[in-house]
Structures are given as structure tokens and as C-alpha cells.
């Protein structure tokens, strides 16, 4: 499947017979930023082959702006695609959280920054809610958006969070980094409206003894499974929230992990790894439900 603008595909997600991606012709992408030049988000219906234009603009922003106009992260669940981008009104251009419904082809703004000093982290979506972090002069705050009721709500976490994702029933967040302190993984139960600290460097359910600072990177969710990697090294972990077990898949990893995938059968986990010594790329697969 080719890109639609002959640009660079920068991120993607897929679930429930949909594949969504963002692309850009922005020459600044090579330095990991974007000035907003000819970016777009598309969705492909894998049942019919139809490709849908979701959103996009051809703008030029100064490099000094405090937000990235190009969506660097997409979250897909059911018919909903969510991402952080921007919106414009008579007062100017502001960062925003956007929701696109693939069924009715409507684009909705879940939240808009009230000033250029406010930015958003990458949102995550389940079949009812969008969850995202908002950053301003006071630090970070955690927000949810009820898609059906069109209502926002702020949820106070036990401590400031730096990364979040949502599952069927939970919000999972990583505590903000502090020097010489391990990060912690917190879980918010929607049904009981309650936070709990689930994983840190002292947690007994963790499979191995932790000799160094515990770090969580690239948090991802599918059903009630959470995956993450440490910032350094090639370890890979899966947490089954329902059984409260952590699987250490490090022994199954033989190369550098490029990214983690959830196939359409969500009992399985697939990741892409490469070998620095050879041009070989592998896609190991493991059935995480039986491992749990």
C-alpha cells in the first residue's frame, strides 16, 4: 500500500479491520520535528480496500512553536482514531486533541489548548473514552473525554505522569522521571474509580531481580495486556492486568527491537527486531494468553 502524498509514513496503528497512518512531505522530519508541511492522516478499510482521508493541512510553522503540528502518534479502537495536532479559530492556532469516526466520517475536537503555553501528550482511546495528558505552567494533568457524552473530566493521579495508555477497563500511567528514582506503573480502575500502584522496582510479581533503575518506554495496550520496554537494552515485558502477572520476554529477543505489534488475533504478540551485524529482520510471535 503506497502513501497517498508520496511522503514519508511516520506512524501507524491497526485494529478491527482498519489500518491508519500519518504521512508528510516535511523536510524537517529528518531531525525528528515537523513544521507542518503537507501532512495527512489516512485510514484503509482492509475489508474493502477503501482509503479514507481523515485530516491534513499544508501549513508552515516556525521551529520555535511549542507543539508539533504533525501527528506523531495515532491510537485506533473500533471506529475511532485519535491523535494530537492543532486547530485554528479567529484568535489563532492552538494545540488540540482530535477524534475521527470512521463510520460517520466526522472529525471532532475533544480538547483545545487555551493558550500557546499549553500542549498535549499522545492520546489513547478505547470504545468509550479518550485519555491524554495536558501540559501547562503547572505541570501535567490527566484528562478523559467521554466520546458519547462529549464531556471532559480531569482525573488526579497519585503523582505526575509522563506516559499513559487506556485498555478496556483501565488507565495505565508511568510516573514522571526523577533522577536516581525508579519509575512506577499506576493503574486506574474505571469501574471503582480508584488508583493503585502496580509495578515498581520492589514489586514481587516482577519476574527478575531489578538491579538498576526501573524504566518504562513505549507503553502499548491491547485488551487488558500492557507492553513496554526499558529505555536501554532489548528487554520486552507484558503485563496481564486481569491476572496481575508480568511476563519477561527478554529471552525471546535476539536483536534490536524496532517496534511492537498486536496482530488481529489479540491473544498473540508480535515484534519486529533487527540484527546490527546482518541485514536480517525478524518478526517473532508469542501467544501471550497461554503464557499468562
Where do the protein language model's features map onto the residues?
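A short beta-strand motif characteristic of beta-propeller blades
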Residues: 1-3, 50-64, 106-113, 150-156, ...
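Structural motif
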Residues: 27-42, 89-98, 137-144, 179-187, ...
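Solenoidal tandem-repeat scaffolds enriched in leucines and small polar residues
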Residues: 88-93, 113-147, 154-164, 173-179
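Residue position within the beta-strands of beta-propeller blades
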Residues: 19-22, 81-84, 130-133, 171-175, ...
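Blade-level signature of beta-propeller repeat domains, shared across WD40, Kelch, NHL, RCC1
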Residues: 256-292
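Beta-strand-rich domains and repeat architectures in extracellular enzymes and scaffolds
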Residues: 2-29
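Repeated scaffold domains used in trafficking and secretory/extracellular systems
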Residues: 6-16, 62-77, 116-126, 158-169, ...
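Short loop/turn segments that connect beta-strands within beta-propeller blades
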Residues: 45-49, 101-105, 146-150, 189-193, ...
